[in-house]
């Protein structure tokens, strides 16, 4: 405890510091400490004063120089060997929120090795860090506390027999408007009182793939680029001149102009009907609540008079926080910054991931534009007044603290029993090791696929393929078995190269499809990982949605949304008792599948090539809306300076691009070729290869294309469609199909061009049906029809005849 003289000296030093700092000359209760150094240093317009007269303890240092950058702060350290001398006391003139920034780097000298230090840090009766084990690299920890006393105590408490240390320290009084008194609890109508909690900064992220350094922020906050956390790809936007703080009623204390003047925008222009999100994934510690702040500033377009509404939803872990409508917020003022605060309660699993998302609002007639400028995530102290994972209270009510405060008497009483247990444990361990080795040899035989795809073990010995993955969708095997009645064979709805697909029902009555990989699966572990990762990267109305996966005990199970009508293949020629598809339905299915593939090809900076497009991988929901499935063979496309990806040939016989088959050169046009084969199946109503037919008809492509070139379209049309579709429409359809099936990829259309042609054909078909309706019932009015068309572009007719389906869609958050 320092005496009154030292206390007054400390106050005097800090008053001098305030006069030396141009940024905060008018702000009281702001302190910068250069710990363990006899001199002051200046970094980013802040003067860090020596703590030689402020605390006891000894110092450790390297070369002490004032280079002006942050590395200067890590050249010395203040070291404490006992609790009595390990406290910094800061006089507080005005109560309120304070930011504490602590710098750590374990220095090594001839007399002291700080890498072995073990200590805890507390402030105002909050545990900030417990049993800290220093990293070998520099670390900056940031905390926010509501100080209601006349002094702020910051203690660095060494473990018995060890030491504690600190390299530099900042204590800043925050503007009153920065932290609210309370914030909304997501998913409830309640608020959480923030003033009774301490906070630790987890992430502070700026959009637009740009970081913001400390010297660009009035409070010297570091804003990381969003590129490291983004699960989807958006378009970066920058417009610093558009930011108008006065219009937003806030100051740049909330966030600097570099945050509000940059944004990441959801790519919705290429496909306005995209049911996609922009999602950022952060690793967090389970067992804590998290305070989240979303920053917004419309620097893109004036919402008034704009043909597209700027209206979108924001989510945290799939739970909706709020709908943002730029025409309502701040009266739609262009360039006016604002923010939205919310609190996410304890993570519902031990995975420890937090997903922040923005997504399109699908219940509006105009195409939405969605964006975000930045966000901040802070961990809130728990009921133990702690911010350390050691004290976490997990969702099931248990504690992460595995230690016990067992009394010495109890330990003595158990010592004899432990000796007996030790002997027994040795025998059991020997038996378990033999059993595990035998099982590992078996698994290596089944999954011998190289170092990149080795099955890992968790602490309980379970095999976990994604043990270090950021994907937070893992389902326990017991839940999967419950949903499928222990993989009852009567629930099998499909069989493929990967394994069997079961229909399942989760506890909340959600129907799901459960794809279980067989041990002898031809696709195997690599394809399983690829499919799970692909399904978590993308969310689109016409791509099947991932619900979860299971890799427990070396299982390879994928759980995705159940598609009531099965596959397109089922409705073309594997009919059984299924109804036949009309020409209109077939066109709608082609359009939907093309949209999904178009999104794969254009929805990110590098295209995703599906590589296994076929009628069996196009699923249909209860309204016959198409969704592309099975991403196990998907491959990232070529870089911008490359034309193709060289890779081993994989796919399904009959659908393979001949250029890819002969040269092993994969491009997006390989998917176009495969889709052309699907288009032939759609119009002909027969499989690609049918050995039961005469030799000249076995191969669908060869047989159909010969007849198309001869103009004998009536010979290839599905008999069910004869007389129900105009030959000129079939002719146009076959012309597009023929281009897709060109031997040379360069002669094939891009998926976007193909989609446009299909949309146009659907438009023509719909107009024909309207005309027929009027002819049959002249008294009927078609003014109220939900089908609207325009030839202005693909986006303008993207909702053709599917408005009812789209209206029923429930938008889900990704990852």
Curated annotation (Swiss-Prot):
Q: From what superkingdom does this record's organism come?
A: Eukaryota
The membrane-topology field of this record reads: Single-pass type I membrane protein
Q: What is its EC number?
A: 2.7.11.-
Q: Which InterPro entries match?
A: Kinase-like_dom_sf, Malectin-like_Carb-bd_dom, Prot_kinase_dom, Protein_kinase_ATP_BS, Ser-Thr/Tyr_kinase_cat_dom, Ser/Thr_kinase_AS, SRK-like_kinase
Give the location in the cell.
Answer: Cell membrane
Q: Active site: which residues?
A: 612
Any one GO CC term of the record: plasma membrane
Q: Which residues bind ATP?
A: 493-501, 515
Sample GO molecular function, one term? ATP binding
Residues on the membrane's Cytoplasmic side span 429-815
Signal peptide region? 1-26
The cross-references to PROSITE patterns, in alphabetical order and at most eight, read: PROTEIN_KINASE_ATP, PROTEIN_KINASE_DOM, PROTEIN_KINASE_ST
What family name appears in the similarity comment? Belongs to the protein kinase superfamily. Ser/Thr protein kinase family.
| Name of the protein | Probable receptor-like protein kinase At2g39360
UniProt source species = Arabidopsis thaliana (Mouse-ear cress)
């Amino acid at each position: 405890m320092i005496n009154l003289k030292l206390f007054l000296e400390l106050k005097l030093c800090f008053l001098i510091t305030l006069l030396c700092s141009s940024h905060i000359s008018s702000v009281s209760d702001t302190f910068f400490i250069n710990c363990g150094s006899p001199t002051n240093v200046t970094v980013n317009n802040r003067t860090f004063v020596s703590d030689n007269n402020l605390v006891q303890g000894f110092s450790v240092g390297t070369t002490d120089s004032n280079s002006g950058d942050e590395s200067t702060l890590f050249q010395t350290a203040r070291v404490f060997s006992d609790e009595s001398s390990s406290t910094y006391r800061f006089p507080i003139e005005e109560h309120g929120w304070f930011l504490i920034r602590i710098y750590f780097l374990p220095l090594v000298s001839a007399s002291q090795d700080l890498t072995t230090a073990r200590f805890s840090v507390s402030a105002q009766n909050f545990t900030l860090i417990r049993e800290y084990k220093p990293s070998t690299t520099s670390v900056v920890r940031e905390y926010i506390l509501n100080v209601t006393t006349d002094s702020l105590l910051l203690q660095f408490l060494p473990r018995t027999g060890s030491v504690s240390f600190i390299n530099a320290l900042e204590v800043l009084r925050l503007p009153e408007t920065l932290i609210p008194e309370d914030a909304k609890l997501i998913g409830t109508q309640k608020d959480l009182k923030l003033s009774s909690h301490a906070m630790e900064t987890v992430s502070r992220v700026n959009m637009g793939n740009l970081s913001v350094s400390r010297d660009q922020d009035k409070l010297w906050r570091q804003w990381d680029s969003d590129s490291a956390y983004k699960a989807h790809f958006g378009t970066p936007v920058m417009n610093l001149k558009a930011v108008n703080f006065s219009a937003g009623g806030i100051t740049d204390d909330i966030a600097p102009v570099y945050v509000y003047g940059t944004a990441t925008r959801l790519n919705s222009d290429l496909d306005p009907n995209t049911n996609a999100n922009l999602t950022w994934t952060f690793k967090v510690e389970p067992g804590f609540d998290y305070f989240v702040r979303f920053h917004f500033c419309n620097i893109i377009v004036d919402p008034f008079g704009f043909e597209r509404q700027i209206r979108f939803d924001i989510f945290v872990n799939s739970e909706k926080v709020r709908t943002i409508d730029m025409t309502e917020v701040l009266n739609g003022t262009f360039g006016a910054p604002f923010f939205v605060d919310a609190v996410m309660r304890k993570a519902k699993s031990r995975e420890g991931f937090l997903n922040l998302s923005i997504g399109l609002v699908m219940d509006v007639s105009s195409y939405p534009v969605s964006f975000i400028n930045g966000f901040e995530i802070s961990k809130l102290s728990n009921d133990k007044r702690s911010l350390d994972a050691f004290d976490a209270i997990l969702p099931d009510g248990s504690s992460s603290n595995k230690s016990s405060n067992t009394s010495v008497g109890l330990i003595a009483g158990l010592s004899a029993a432990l000796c007996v247990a030790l002997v027994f444990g040795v025998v059991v361990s020997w038996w378990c090791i033999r059993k595990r080795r035998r099982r590992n040899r078996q698994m290596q035989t089944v999954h011998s696929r190289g170092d990149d795809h080795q099955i890992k073990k968790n602490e309980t010995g379970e095999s976990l393929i994604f043990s270090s993955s950021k994907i937070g969708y893992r389902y326990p095997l017991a839940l999967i078995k419950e949903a499928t009645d222990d993989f009852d064979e009567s629930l099998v709805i499909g069989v493929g190269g990967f394994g069997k697909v079961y229909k399942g029902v989760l506890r909340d009555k959600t129907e799901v499809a459960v794809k279980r990989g067989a041990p002898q699966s031809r696709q195997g572990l690599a394809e399983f990982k690829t499919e799970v990762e692909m399904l978590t990267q993308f969310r689109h109305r016409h791509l099947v949605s991932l619900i979860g996966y299971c890799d427990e005990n070396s299982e390879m199970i994928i759980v995705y949304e159940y598609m009531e009508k099965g596959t397109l293949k089922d409705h073309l020629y594997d009919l059984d008792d299924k109804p036949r598809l009309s020409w209109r339905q077939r066109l709608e299915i082609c359009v939907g599948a093309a949209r999904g593939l178009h999104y794969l090809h254009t929805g990110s900076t590098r295209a995703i090539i599906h590589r296994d497009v076929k009628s069996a991988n196009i699923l249909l929901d209860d309204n016959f809306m198409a969704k592309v499935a099975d991403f196990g063979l998907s491959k990232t496309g070529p870089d911008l300076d490359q034309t193709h990806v060289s890779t081993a040939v994989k796919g399904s016989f009959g659908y393979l691009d001949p250029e890819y088959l002969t040269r092993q050169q994969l491009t997006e046009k390989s998917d176009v070729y495969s889709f052309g084969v699907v288009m032939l199946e759609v119009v002909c109503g027969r499989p690609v290869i049918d050995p039961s037919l005469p030799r000249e008809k076995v191969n669908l492509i060869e047989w159909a294309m010969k007849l198309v070139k001869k103009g004998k379209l009536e010979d290839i049309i599905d008999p069910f469609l004869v007389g129900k579709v105009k030959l000129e429409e079939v002719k146009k359809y076959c012309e597009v199909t023929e281009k897709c099936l060109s031997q040379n990829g360069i002669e094939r259309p891009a998926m976007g061009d193909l989609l446009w042609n299909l949309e146009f054909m659907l438009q023509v078909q719909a107009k024909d049906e309207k005309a027929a309706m009027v002819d049959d019932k002249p008294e009927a009015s078609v003014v109220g029809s939900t089908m609207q068309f325009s030839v202005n572009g693909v986006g303008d007719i993207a909702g053709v005849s599917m408005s009812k389906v789209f209206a029923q869609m429930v938008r889900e958050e990704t990852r």
